[in-house]
Amino acid sequence: EAAVTCGDERLTVEHYGVLMQNEYAAEAYVYAVLRNTSGQRLPIQSIQMTVKNGSGRALHEERYVSHLPGVVEPNGTLLVSEWMYDFTKDIGKVASIDITVETDTRAYERWNRLDGVRAWQEGQYLYVELTNTTEETLFGAVCGATLETADGQILDMMLQSSYETMDVGIAPKSTVVWRKRLEDGATLKLGADTVCEAWAYRVETY
């Protein structure tokens, strides 16, 4: 399996998963969870992925990779997810996928971690449940979740966009559930020992 790396000394790759398919078209699902070990807040400007072969030659590049959150606090986690399709005829030669992170000099929004979130896998879906534990209607809540094997390989990931939820309100003590259909490559590797983890944030713009 191809390895996922990050040359940025501020971030450490903790878990990752690469699901490659070449039955109908050359495509890959790439997931990673990185830890901010810099001791500083990191406002994310953009994330790129570079696919390399065993000798380090670039086979393909994705310039705008999905991620969550938009600002990573010290010791916080950064979720990264990308679907690459028709990206190379050399899919069998892929040895590594390198993540490059560009940051801003200052943050223009704050991503506050929320309690009351959990994730689970049931059948063909990854579910995320968020309960508003505050006394006010909660707007701008964004969730992310991973489905992993017992040894930490990420099989699938759900990432929400703040644009999708900024005007959605969750009443106090109320619960909302989202779901994502698992990719085919993930369902083939499902076992009784899979583990789900969830994150939730409230986005506030300065």
Tell where the protein language model's regions lie, with residue ranges.
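Low-complexity, acidic Ser/Thr/Pro/Gly-rich terminal tails and inter-domain linkers that flank the onset
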Residues: 1-27, 31, 97-125
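Intrinsically disordered, low-complexity Pro/Gly/Ser/Thr-rich segments with frequent PxxP/GP/PP motifs
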Residues: 59-89, 157-186
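Asparagine-centered strand-capping/turn motif at beta-strand->loop junctions
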Residues: 22, 34-39, 53, 130-134
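Short, structured motif recognition centered on aromatic/hydrophobic residues
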Residues: 32, 42, 47-51, 138, ...
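Short acidic/proline- and small/hydrophobic-mixed sequence motifs that coincide with surface turns
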Residues: 39-44, 58-60, 137-140, 154-156
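Terminal connector regions
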Residues: 83-125, 181-206
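Hydrophobic core residues within well-ordered beta-strands of beta-rich domains
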Residues: 28-30, 45, 78, 124-126, ...
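Short aromatic-acidic-glycine turn motif
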Residues: 50-62, 147-159
